[in-house]
Regions:
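Terminal, low-structured helical/coil segments at or just beyond the last alpha-helical repeat
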Residues: 562-569, 577-580, 584-587, 599-600, ...
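Structural marker of alpha-solenoid helical repeat scaffolds
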Residues: 440, 474, 508, 542, ...
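Glycine-centered coil turns and helix-coil junctions that link the paired helices
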Residues: 170, 553, 557-564, 636-637
Length: 648
């Protein structure tokens, strides 16, 4: 009986433990911290979300919806595989946290003790990064129509900057987060984007971002709901010069009524110039051509790194038909590293994935990407019903498939090597893309101009001539159109025709400094040194801070075939101005200075200038030419340019 009594007692104890209740979660202690940390960036006053989650009443009102969207992992939006990274701001809920929210709702959405609430966040006038040093706003609001498909509008915002600044951070405020879904931001140091904006009746313009508008010195600039890039380290700032415009491509979705959109941008400055410059690598194909109904169309691309790099950030980009993206690195020893995988791509949730700590990849690593598209009626995001053929293009109704990578190299020579080699790869792909765009829009002069510049970049000047001729015919004979055609003709070796085009540009616009400068170059190649010098002097007179004009004039005064045309002391003065303008970081400028010093008999200084130029690792054939000239300086001999007349 004693044994039975003990067994019964143990049974009672065991039964008691089995009935212990797990505490019911409360809002103040368990749910409010989760909401603030994972949802607060969007579900805040003026945030991108359609409603706020700032109070117990807010969260209780949407409690059932929160359970649903967290359980299916639709919210908070984080499309990348959780095993990727770790990335800055990586904030998917864990399974335990999702279950905690469910238990709170099942338990009656208990509020709890107010003393358990986390301290509220306080933004400075809505700026997450603190008070900006400069705030710019679209001068006039844009009116988004009530109905219709998504709208992509390009806004140009001039920057009131009177001196060179260095930027540590940029924060974008959409102005109307209910309808602005994401934005890509670039900088344009020319007036080209502004001219398109001015030509349009309303704020901004429709179409494509020009090639003159680009990301600054290897930095991503953009905005998606809930994402604010942290301030950059002081050694990674980017340069902002006067007369620069911000070019904002905004993706907007009609709400059912007319909406006013007036975005603002806050800039954060530093007095410290960068000591390191990132590179932007873009994997992708511009030959995309997806048949209607195709469910498994695949696009791949890869690149072998010529130098060691540290990967700072990734950004996949595609449109509505894309369903999956994968980025991978294969190390020289064959080891594979998954960079990013998004199994359910959604164009509406683009994101820059910035590593918490840079990912090191050694020289010889192959970086690759793979996109999968579904152009069938089964794809709920397909913008065409019924599906139609989809080709590469920058409009949202077209398709794209890129994986951008921001990387840092170990030193400046490695950066030069990487950017030079990778740019050659990208330019060939860009030619394909622009030819596709021109097929669809044959009368777009901007497309013809951009395609022509790409043909020049890949060493196919006759292709450039054809596109510039078409642009000239469309523009009706403007000075820039004649100038562009003259440039392509000169590269193609058609010098007499080039001279004619440059002279027509100058006749239309006598103050066209670049036309005078390029005309001088062609005349010099024809052996007409005196005429060339006159054109170079006109170019410098019209644009005294033009490094190109100063360098060309200094070069001919230092190296002219005939001694009577050489003026060494003036050449030295001009070359020193060029070197100062380029902060001693331009190998060609230093080469000109070396030639000028040698012409003046200062051979030690000439050798030093050549050595400094070579340390910048210039591309061939410039590097070989500098070495040959340096050998002359060691022998106490100046460099004298060959006389074109002697080669005829």
């Amino acid at each position: 009986m004693k044994v039975a009594t003990v067994a019964l007692a143990l049974g009672i104890v065991a039964s008691g433990f089995s009935r212990t209740q797990v505490p019911i979660p409360t809002y103040t202690k368990d749910i409010a911290p989760l909401i603030a940390d994972r949802c607060g960036m969007c579900h805040d006053v003026g945030g991108a979300a359609p409603f706020g989650l700032l109070t117990y009443a807010d969260v209780k009102r949407h409690a059932t919806q929160i359970v649903t969207v967290t359980r299916n992992r639709y919210m908070p939006p984080w499309k990348a595989d959780p095993s990727n990274g770790p990335f800055v701001g990586q904030h998917p809920l864990t399974s335990a946290e999702i279950d905690l929210i469910r238990r709170w709702v099942d338990g009656g959405t208990v509020e709890g003790d107010p003393r358990d609430l986390p301290a509220p966040r306080h933004w400075t006038d809505g700026w997450r990064l603190g008070p900006p040093d400069l705030i710019v706003t679209l001068p006039q609001p844009y009116t988004l129509q009530a109905e219709g498909t998504d709208v992509f509008r390009i806004f140009v915002i001039p920057l009131p900057v009177s001196r060179t600044r260095f930027v540590r951070g940029l924060e974008f405020r959409p102005g109307n987060p209910k309808v602005v879904h994401h934005a890509n931001i670039r900088v344009d140091t020319t007036a080209a984007s502004r001219a398109l904006d001015d030509a349009d009746q309303g704020p901004g313009y429709n179409g494509l971002i020009l090639r003159s508008a680009d990301y600054p010195e290897g930095h991503f600039l953009g905005w998606t709901p809930g994402q604010v890039a942290p301030l950059l380290p002081k050694d990674l700032t980017w340069r902002l010069d006067p007369k620069t415009d911000l070019v904002v491509e905004a993706h907007m979705q009609p709400s059912g009524k007319k909406e006013s959109v007036q975005p603002s941008i806050g800039l954060y400055f530093s007095d410290t110039p960068p000591t390191r410059t990132p590179a932007m690598l873009r994997l992708g194909r511009q030959t995309i051509d997806i048949p209607a109904g195709e469910k498994q169309y695949t696009v791949t691309d890869s690149y072998v790194l010529p130098v060691d790099v540290e990967v700072e950030a990734l950004q996949p980009h595609a449109h509505y038909r894309a369903r999956e993206v994968q980025g991978e690195a294969t190390l020289p020893d064959g080891t594979k590293r998954l960079l990013i995988h998004i199994a359910d791509w959604d164009f509406r949730w683009q994101h820059v994935f910035q590593y918490e700590s840079p990912l090191r990849l050694p020289k010889g690593t192959t970086v690759s990407m793979r996109w999968v598209y579904d152009n069938s009626a089964d794809n709920p995001r397909n913008p065409q019903r019924p599906p139609v053929r989809a080709q590469w293009g920058q409009r949202s109704s077209d398709e794209m498939g890129d994986l951008w990578m921001q990387v840092l190299t170990r030193n400046e020579p490695d950066l030069v090597t990487l950017t030079r080699q990778f740019r050659a790869k990208v330019a060939v792909e860009d030619v394909n893309g622009y030819e596709l765009e021109i097929e669809k829009h044959p009368d777009d002069t901007g497309l013809h101009d951009s395609a022509a510049l790409l043909y020049l970049e890949v060493g196919r000047p006759e292709g450039a001539v054809a596109h510039f001729q078409k642009a000239l015919a469309l523009k009706g004979g403007s000075a820039p159109a004649h100038y562009n055609l003259g440039t392509a003709l000169s590269v193609a070796g058609r010098l007499d025709e080039a001279v004619s085009e440059y002279r027509q540009a100058i006749q239309i616009d006598g103050g066209y400094a670049n036309a005078h400068n390029n005309l001088g170059g062609v005349l010099l190649a024809q052996g007409k040194t005196g005429e060339a010098v006159r054109e170079f002097r006109d170019a410098v007179r019209l644009q005294p801070q033009s490094a190109s004009g100063l360098a060309n004039l200094a070069w001919v005064l230092a190296t002219a075939p005939q001694a009577a045309d050489r003026h060494a002391n003036e050449a030295v003065d001009l070359a020193m101005r060029v070197v100062d303008l380029t902060a001693r970081r331009d190998a060609r400028a230093l080469d000109v200075l070396g030639a000028a010093y040698a012409s003046a008999g200062q051979f030690d200084r000439a050798q030093e200038a050549a050595s400094t130029a070579l340390r910048l690792a210039p591309a061939e054939p410039l590097a070989a030419e500098i070495r040959r000239r340096q050998d002359l300086y060691r022998q106490g001999r100046p460099y004298v340019a060959p006389d074109p007349a002697s080669r005829r």
